[in-house]
């Protein structure tokens, strides 16, 4: 299992040192939470792009971009030049199937892996038709918008169901879980079948980032 560290709670005055510490701690990805103040209440658009650009200049750790926005296409254009490994858009942000499919294609045409994210209340069956076209499903294990929330336990059976479907249909699609993940509950998610865990507060606020990340990986 890989760890994608959310930098949502990183303070600007400590940002560069924190990014360096996370690289030394061997995070697998930097998770970039892009919020527009519309799809979710919080707005991180300006400083997240600044953070992502800084990381690209000082680190070789890949970026994992999660767009929690009403108009994903506009934000994708901001991030494409940074060559993130993943750009993930929310299923709920699209009114029409064609809009979603066109957006996924646009991400892939620009050299990134496309992902779809779903909120805790969205059933996994709704994204089954898209699984052949994407590399990642991001299952929100809290309501999107804020860090430091408690994991919603009812999302775990949803992850198991998704994992079974992917394996039965021999699909090449990873599962990522995001929200409320810590040392106490990460093993449940590992057993449910996730490939990548997005972890924020539990790493950023720990006394030893490297030790915390290594414990989470094993």
Give the label of every model feature segment.
Residues 30-49, 91-93, 142-148:
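Glycine-rich, proline-tolerant flexible connector loops at the mouths of alpha/beta enzymes
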Residues 3-6, 30-32, 63-67, 87-89, ...:
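Hydrophobic faces of well-ordered beta-strands that scaffold small-molecule active sites
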Residues 15, 22, 30-33, 79, ...:
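Conserved, mostly hydrophobic/aromatic
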């Amino acid at each position: 299992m890989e760890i994608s560290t959310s930098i949502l709670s990183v303070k600007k005055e400590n940002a560069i040192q924190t990014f360096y510490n996370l690289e030394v701690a061997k995070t697998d990805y930097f998770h970039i939470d892009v919020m527009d103040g519309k799809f979710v209440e919080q707005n991180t658009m300006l400083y997240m792009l600044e953070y992502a650009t800084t990381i690209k200049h000082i680190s070789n750790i890949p970026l994992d971009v999660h767009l929690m926005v009403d108009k994903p296409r506009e934000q994708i254009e901001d991030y494409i030049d940074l060559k993130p490994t993943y750009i993930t858009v929310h299923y709920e942000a699209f009114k029409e199937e064609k809009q979603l499919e066109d957006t996924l294609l646009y991400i892939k045409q620009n050299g990134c892996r496309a992902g779809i994210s779903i909120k805790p209340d969205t059933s996994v069956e709704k994204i089954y038709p898209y699984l052949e076209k994407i590399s990642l499903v991001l299952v929100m294990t809290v309501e999107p918008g804020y860090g430091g929330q408690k994991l919603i336990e009812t999302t775990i059976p949803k992850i198991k169901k998704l994992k079974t479907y992917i394996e039965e249909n021999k699909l090449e699609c990873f599962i990522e879980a995001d929200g409320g993940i810590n040392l106490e509950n990460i093993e449940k998610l590992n057993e449910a079948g996730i490939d990548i865990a997005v972890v924020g507060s539990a790493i950023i606020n720990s006394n030893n980032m490297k030790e915390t990340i290594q414990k989470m990986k094993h």
